[in-house]
């Protein structure tokens, strides 16, 4: 169970880093938002899901 928690935290950190870089780039590029809107929403949904997963796994470990 600890390995799953560590992998979920690692995935959350990687996803956060990717979103931290990609979202401002999408907003700054001309015509970037309309062409990459689905990618940003998918990344945000993945991030929210990982936050809940880390919270659930943390409550099971502690």
UniProtKB/Swiss-Prot annotation:
GO terms for biological process: photosynthesis; photosystem II stabilization. The chain crosses the membrane at residues 8-28, 41-61. It is found in: Plastid, Chloroplast thylakoid membrane. It is a multi-pass membrane protein. It comes from the Eukaryota. Its main location: plastid. Keywords: Chloroplast, Membrane, Photosynthesis, Photosystem II, Plastid, Reaction center, Thylakoid, Transmembrane, Transmembrane helix. One of its GO terms (cellular component) is chloroplast thylakoid membrane. InterPro entries: PSII_PsbZ, PSII_PsbZ_sf. The keyword DNA repair does not apply. May control the interaction of photosystem II (PSII) cores with the light-harvesting antenna, regulates electron flow through the 2 photosystem reaction centers. PSII is a light-driven water plastoquinone oxidoreductase, using light energy to abstract electrons from H(2)O, generating a proton gradient subsequently used for ATP formation. Belongs to the PsbZ family. PSII is composed of 1 copy each of membrane proteins PsbA, PsbB, PsbC, PsbD, PsbE, PsbF, PsbH, PsbI, PsbJ, PsbK, PsbL, PsbM, PsbT, PsbY, PsbZ, Psb30/Ycf12, at least 3 peripheral proteins of the oxygen-evolving complex and a large number of cofactors. It forms dimeric complexes. HAMAP family: PSII_PsbZ. This is Photosystem II reaction center protein Z. It comes from Arabidopsis thaliana.
């Amino acid at each position: 169970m600890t390995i799953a928690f560590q992998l979920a935290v690692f995935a959350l950190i990687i996803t956060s880093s990717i979103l931290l870089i990609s979202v401002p780039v999408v907003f700054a590029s001309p015509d970037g938002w309309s062409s990459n809107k689905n990618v940003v929403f998918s990344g945000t949904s993945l991030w929210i899901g990982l936050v809940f997963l880390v919270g659930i796994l943390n409550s099971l470990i502690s």
